[in-house]
Structures are given as structure tokens and as C-alpha cells.
């Protein structure tokens, strides 16, 4: 349910059921005869989100402001089946529930015809419990991926239940719809999972 609050603001209530399936190896050393670990996570989620957005583009904006606050409750049942390279030997089942708080702010403090300077920050607080193994836990966590290309990779260093990322967007507009961008970010996980080998 979306509800407009002003010209650039909206409030959204969302309830959904989900069925997530992940096939993965817990090691880099595997052959074509090995079988993957398999984890399913079935459940439901409810969230409330407030967004104020006056950015001029959906991606790679160079003008405007963005503010997002999202609170999400997740409940579900995990079922993990170990593969041939897994240190676990038996199937695992566990109930999970957690709250996820996400805050994101972006503001272009200098906005000229040829030069734009923006500040961008994102913070996540997540009370997610551990899944049956390291990889399954990370796959279920929120990732820090402000660049769309990062969504296509599994980068464990940028997955953490509690983290903050902040950066500076330096943009030179050569002509309309053609920018040269230098985006620099700092990522700080407050809680990070370490794999024990």
C-alpha cells in the first residue's frame, strides 16, 4: 500500500510471502562431480518505508536529494541440505525472525551546470540470527552495493548485519545526459562474520 505524503514523498506498507532457494559451494576447491549445498528459506515479511526523493534520475543522479527509512520484520523457516564438499553431514532446519532497519541519505550540496558534489550515506542495523553455515548466513544478509554491478557478484566482505557506508559523488557534466563521475565510498562493518577454516 503506497500513500503519497507530498510531491516528492511517499509512505509504503508492504506484506509479502517469499521462497528463497540458494545452491552454493562452501569452498573454492570443487570438481564437476561435487554436489552443491542447498538452502531454502520460506516465510513472510512486513515492512514500512518512508521515501523523500527529488533526484533527477533513477540511477546515477547529479541533482536533488534522497532520504529513505525502511523498517522490515522477517519471519521464516530455513532448511539446509549439505553437499559433497560441506563440513556438515546432516540436514538442518531452523526458524528465524529478525528486524532490519535501513537508512539512506543522498544530497547534492553543490549543483552547478558543469559541476556537482554530492554526499551519500547508507546504514543498516539487522538482528538476523545465524543460518546453518557461513555462506547461507551471508546470502541472507543485506549487502552494501551502491553500484548496480556489485549486485551480480557475491562479495562476502560487503555483507554484514550492521554496517555504515558513506561517500562523496564528484560529477562533471560534459553535456546533457553525459557525466564524468568519481564516486568514492568508505564502508565500515560494525559486526562482521569471519569464516573459520
Where do the PLM segments sit?
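Transmembrane beta-barrel wall of Gram-negative outer-membrane proteins
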Residues: 1-35
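C-terminal outer-membrane beta-barrel translocator/porin domains of Gram-negative envelope proteins
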Residues: 43-175, 179-182, 192-194
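An acidic/polar, Gly/Ser/Thr-rich interaction patch typically located in mid-to-C-terminal regions
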Residues: 185-186
